[in-house]
Swiss-Prot record:
Component of the mitochondrial ribosome large subunit (39S) which comprises a 16S rRNA and about 50 distinct proteins. Keywords: Acetylation, Mitochondrion, Ribonucleoprotein, Ribosomal protein, Transit peptide. CDD domains: NUDIX_MRP_L46. This is Large ribosomal subunit protein mL46. GO terms for molecular function: structural constituent of ribosome. SUPFAM superfamilies: Nudix (SSF55811). Belongs to the mitochondrion-specific ribosomal protein mL46 family. The keyword Ribonucleoprotein applies.
Length: 279
């Protein structure tokens, strides 16, 4: 009995020694790999913080036929199960007083109160008849003016700007190069600050980037220490402000997710579409 137990213990001990040797080897290999990695200060890639500035929908989308039927059903259930409002209770009391009037059981002093409830309903009816719904299709929609924020009111709009890279004009999300000592979100906030001449305010959604894009510089600009750039995107919702139409005509657009393909390069567009939603 003692011999099998001893062999088992020796086997366990031998396995543990082999595990320790493998573990030590893997740690030393990992240390060598980290030591061989270039430092961040000497990286040939430049870091950029980009701003994905969105204007949320200003109106709700039109209901589909199914949604209209569902809304009607829920409204009917609400009417059947809800309690009387204060005005409805007052109207019931008014009906009782009118019934008493017919039986000559009412007091003339109560007539003012009886008429007041009806007057309120008449005033509300007139207000309702005078109310006009705003147009969903704006003048900017009719002219296809994509520099205006007053378009596609039921869709998310994204800001694109036109920048010059070499001898080409390229549409991109607004971006700024990272500076030592600041966070990438700080870089994106500084990007927004470059548009501050238009008094634009926005709410950033988190501290982590929502996406990234890597590109190499043109061959004429590329060197061993300057291969390209890595762009990190940060989402923000527009609160107030807009571009000055006079100073930026033709240099920016507000577009929907479906319209991005008219401006962005295919590879850049693929990365941007990954973190954009249009609910």
């Amino acid at each position: 009995m003692a011999a099998p137990v001893r062999r088992t213990l020796l086997g366990v001990a031998g396995g543990w020694r082999r595990f320790e040797r493998l573990r030590a080897g893997s740690l030393s290999s990992r240390s060598l790999a980290l030591a061989a990695a270039p430092s961040s200060n000497g990286s040939p890639w430049r870091l950029l913080g980009a701003l994905c500035l969105q204007r949320p929908p200003a109106v709700s989308k039109p209901l589909t036929p199914f949604q209209e039927e569902m809304a009607s059903l829920l409204q009917q259930i609400e009417i059947e199960r809800s309690l009387y409002s204060d005005h409805e209770l007052r109207a019931l009391d008014e009906n009782q007083r009118l019934a008493g009037k017919k039986a000559d059981l009412y007091d003339e002093e109560d007539e003012e109160d009886i008429l007041l409830a009806q007057d309120l309903e008449d005033m509300w009816e007139q207000t309702f008849l005078q109310f006009k719904l705003g147009a969903r299709i704006t003048e900017a929609d009719e002219k296809n003016d994509r520099t205006s924020l007053n378009r596609k009111l039921d869709r998310n709009l994204v800001l694109l700007v036109r920048e010059k890279f070499g001898d080409q004009d390229v549409w991109i999300l607004p971006q700024t190069e990272w500076q030592p000592g600041e966070t990438l979100r700080g870089t994106a906030e500084r990007t927004l600050a470059t548009l501050s001449e238009n008094n634009m305010e926005a709410k950033f959604l988190g501290n982590a980037p929502c996406g990234h894009y890597t590109f190499k510089f043109p061959q004429a600009m590329r060197t061993e220490s300057n291969l390209g750039a890595k762009v990190f995107f940060f989402k923000a919702l527009l609160l107030t402000g807009d571009f000055s139409q006079a100073g930026n005509k033709g240099h920016h657009v507000w577009v929907t997710k479906d319209e991005l393909g008219d401006y962005l390069k295919p590879k850049y567009l693929a990365q941007v579409r990954r973190f954009l939603s249009d609910l």
